């Protein structure tokens, strides 16, 4: 019953797709491989979805019998994608093999994923795969200018991605096509399906009832090479939504409230499943917003059941065949009735939120779970000495750039313009996709923003991921705090603009618009008033949103490149002198010995996110060059030992104070392996596997933390490192800068067994502490082979 691949029955077909009166003759390409059949084109073929739905009935019936109970919706989708239906399903304990329907990758993480895939020795990808050029476009002037600049600056990388997609049978969405998650929602997501993507906000697809999970590039390579994806069977958190949103309250406020309740690590190892009448009252794109930002609570993914709003969105995005097919399978695309009647019996945790009572929220700074209602921010800012003045307001990102989001914010801008009001700070708008941009341009919504002084950026991630050049606005040297408000998802220090003094707050697009008009965080959009040029005071009206464009979506410019019919002879060139791309050498296998006398490269205090470990922003250009990107290793880490600036520590070989990447390079050149120590939730944030590949490249062998974020822990395992968790979190405090660590009994590494770490202090005194790990039997083979990719390579080339 293996799901090695799902596709069309014949080799080549041509289908005409009607995109709201815009006819696109799209090549559907089905590629025969020794592992099955796959298809790449601009939408998910109905045949693939029919195949997925065809196994629901039998699999779910058998699962109910096996488990002796009814099923939640998330369980239904996962069970239907099991490689083998006979695997043990113990929440938070057993590991399972899954067969995702497709893979999506963004251009920053895709480089390393493709470089890894190229070493596997296969001619084609085994499942439908797409690469989306959205991360490498830096915002500076405005959309067209920035896109042209990016096309020149990143020409080598774009050429590589386009050619590697062509050679191996994948689709390529060109720069300007839009943010990966918005494009996936518009083109590929479908209820009951499963996708993995090399970006942590892949769960955006849960808004259409899809299991959509962010992974590292090595995980994607597993699936692209035809292997199942191995993951721990998740726990389940149920969120019961009651009532309806009203007034200024938006879907964004739901997830901001959930983040407050669960915190940034409360969802770790769990899928969050939303249900209830309140869930049905949300639009599909509103659902996507909530699922998208579920990454900020550490959740494996989030999901909503199929309902009428999802049906409407599918029809509006020219997928009526998918909508009708989903409707006819609706019983499988929602939780069983008994689950909805007694959710406490089926979920590990249940949260209830009354949407009628929910009020607009704004979270931050520096962490997405520091929440309060919008009207409370002014007083809190004053008490903390934060600036009240807003330096920039930003609307968009993969979290909040749907048509409905834009219409609600634009209604505020339109009203303000009628009274002669302008934004009192820099206002930047990011359309989520070319389709959204073309549609909101046609419908006059971008003009509404421009009337109050907004600048429209490229259809890309931009400032949300640090691709924002605002060097003329801020001075990193002075350390002068400044405040920005965004409709984004993350607000870690330096995340958006590289400035550690920037205080970033996340909220809904309409609240961002209101605060931009006020120019201060000390403003209540609901009860406050704004002064016009004539001295009159006006209160802002309640935002008015339109769920879907009445005239349909305008697809805009064609930005998809399908792979050619036969490109196996195509050569993917990587210059040996390139500073952007570098072919990979396999990491060495474990030598069979314990790790002895390892120095500590860094012991990090507090947040130790992937942004702290491997910064984005200006470093994004090196994402395809492992040696060069390693120049940012741990630059954002706060040293737990006193007397150091951020990103600095002591080189124990020389006694010098250096940056962490300088120390790592020194240890590498001296062939000195080392260990890294983390605090709580190490690796929180993005899916970037560079945060695991860089330390491995520089001879990092072990990472020990009080706890790990899911994706980062998996990425460390994939690259052959040993992530260990303190059995007693207090042992973290016992480790000193000059200590040497030895990891014992690695020959006995097995699931569930504790690992002993011996510590030798500079005085000669020794002590030991226990650690736990989450390795499965299969994952232990990754460790022994040196990486998961080494295991794949040995099997594909045998």
Positions of the model-derived regions?
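Flexible inter-domain linker/hinge segments
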Residues: 42-47, 57-62, 68, 77-83, ...
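Mobile "lid/hinge" segments at catalytic clefts and subdomain interfaces of large enzymes
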Residues: 41-44, 191-323, 421, 460-463, ...
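Single conserved hydrophobic/aromatic residue that forms the stacking wall/gate
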Residues: 1-15
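Acidic, glycine-rich flexible loop/linker segments
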Residues: 530-547, 713-782, 789-792, 797
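Extracellular/luminal Protease-associated
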Residues: 275-280, 489, 665-708
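Long, structured ligand/cofactor-binding scaffold of large enzymes
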Residues: 49, 56, 61-234, 624-673, ...
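Accessory "access/gating" subregions that flank catalytic or transport cores
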Residues: 148-152, 156-157, 162-197, 273-276, ...
């Amino acid at each position: 019953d293996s799901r090695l691949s799902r596709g069309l029955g014949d080799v080549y077909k041509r289908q005409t797709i009607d995109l709201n009166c815009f006819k696109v003759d799209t090549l559907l390409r089905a590629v025969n491989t020794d592992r099955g059949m796959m298809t790449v084109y601009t939408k998910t073929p109905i045949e693939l979805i029919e195949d997925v739905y065809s196994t629901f009935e039998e699999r779910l019936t058998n699962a109910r019998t096996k488990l002796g109970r009814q099923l939640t919706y998330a369980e239904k989708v996962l069970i239907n994608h099991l490689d083998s239906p006979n695997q043990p399903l113990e929440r938070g304990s057993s590991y399972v093999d899954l067969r995702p329907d497709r893979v999506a990758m963004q251009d920053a993480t895709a480089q390393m994923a493709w470089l890894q895939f190229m070493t596997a020795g296969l001619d084609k990808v085994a499942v439908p795969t797409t690469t989306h050029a959205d991360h490498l476009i830096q915002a500076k002037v405005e959309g067209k200018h920035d896109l042209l600049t990016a096309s020149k600056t990143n020409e080598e990388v774009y050429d590589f991605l386009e050619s590697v997609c062509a050679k191996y049978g994948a689709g390529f969405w060109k720069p300007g096509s839009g943010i990966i998650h918005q494009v996936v929602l518009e083109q590929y997501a479908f209820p009951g399906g499963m996708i993995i993507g090399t970006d942590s906000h892949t769960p955006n697809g849960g808004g259409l009832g899809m299991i959509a999970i962010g992974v590292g590039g090595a995980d994607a390579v597993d699936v692209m090479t035809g292997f199942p994806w191995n993951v721990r069977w998740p726990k389940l958190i149920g969120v019961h939504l009651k009532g309806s949103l009203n007034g200024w309250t938006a879907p964004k406020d739901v997830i901001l409230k959930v983040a407050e309740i669960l915190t940034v690590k409360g969802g770790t190892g769990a899928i969050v499943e939303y249900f209830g009448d309140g869930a049905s009252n949300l639009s599909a794109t509103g659902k996507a917003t909530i699922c998208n930002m579920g990454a900020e609570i550490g959740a494996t993914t989030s999901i909503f059941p199929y309902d009428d709003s999802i049906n409407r969105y599918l029809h509006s995005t020219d997928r009526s065949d998918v909508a009708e097919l989903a409707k006819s399978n609706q019983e499988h695309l929602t939780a069983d009735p008994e689950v909805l009647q007694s959710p406490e019996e089926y979920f590990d945790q249940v949260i209830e939120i009354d949407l009628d009572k929910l009020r607009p929220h704004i979270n931050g700074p520096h962490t997405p779970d520091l929440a309060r209602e919008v009207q409370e921010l002014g007083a809190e800012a004053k008490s903390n000495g934060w600036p009240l003045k807003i330096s920039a307001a930003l609307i968009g990102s993969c979290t909040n750039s749907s048509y409905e989001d834009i219409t609600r914010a634009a209604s505020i801008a339109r009203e303000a313009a009628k009274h002669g009001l302008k934004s009192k700070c820099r206002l930047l708008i990011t359309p989520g996709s070319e389709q959204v941009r073309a549609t909101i341009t046609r419908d006059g919504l971008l003009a509404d923003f421009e009337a109050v002084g907004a600048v429209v950026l490229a259809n890309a991630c931009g400032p949300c991921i640090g691709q924002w050049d605002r060097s003329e606005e801020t001075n990193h040297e002075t350390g002068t705090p400044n405040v920005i408000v965004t409709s984004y998802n993350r607000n870690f220090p330096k995340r958006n603009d590289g400035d550690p003094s920037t205080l970033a707050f996340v909220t809904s697009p309409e609240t961002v618009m209101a605060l931009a008009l006020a120019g201060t965080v000390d403003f209540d959009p609901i009860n406050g008033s704004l002064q016009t040029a004539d001295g009159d005071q006006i209160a802002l009206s309640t935002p008015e949103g339109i769920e879907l464009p009445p005239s349909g979506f305008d697809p805009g410019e064609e930005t998809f490149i399908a792979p050619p019919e036969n490109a196996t002879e195509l050569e993917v060139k990587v210059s040996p002198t390139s500073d952007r791309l570098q072919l990979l050498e396999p990491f060495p296998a474990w030598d069979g010995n314990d790790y002895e006398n390892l120095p500590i490269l860094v012991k990090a205090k507090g947040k130790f996110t992937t942004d702290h470990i491997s910064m984005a922003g200006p470093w994004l250009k090196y994402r395809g060059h492992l040696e060069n990107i390693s120049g940012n290793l741990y630059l954002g880490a706060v040293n737990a030992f006193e007397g150091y600036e951020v990103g600095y520590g002591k080189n124990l070989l020389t006694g010098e104070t250096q940056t962490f990447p300088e120390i790592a390079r020194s240890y590498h050149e001296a062939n000195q392996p080392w260990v890294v120590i983390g605090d709580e939730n190490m690796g929180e944030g993005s899916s970037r596997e560079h945060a695991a590949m860089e330390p491995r490249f520089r001879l990092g062998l072990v990472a020990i933390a009080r706890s790990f974020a899911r994706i980062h822990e998996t990425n460390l395992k994939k690259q052959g490192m040993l992530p260990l968790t303190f059995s007693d979190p207090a042992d973290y405090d016992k480790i000193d800068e000059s200590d040497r660590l030895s990891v014992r009994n690695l020959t006995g590494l097995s699931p569930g067994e504790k690992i002993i770490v011996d510590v030798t202090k500079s005085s000669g005194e020794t002590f030991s502490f226990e650690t736990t790990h989450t390795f499965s039997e299969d994952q232990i083979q990754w460790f022994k082979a040196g990486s998961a990719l080494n295991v794949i390579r040995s099997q594909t080339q045998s």
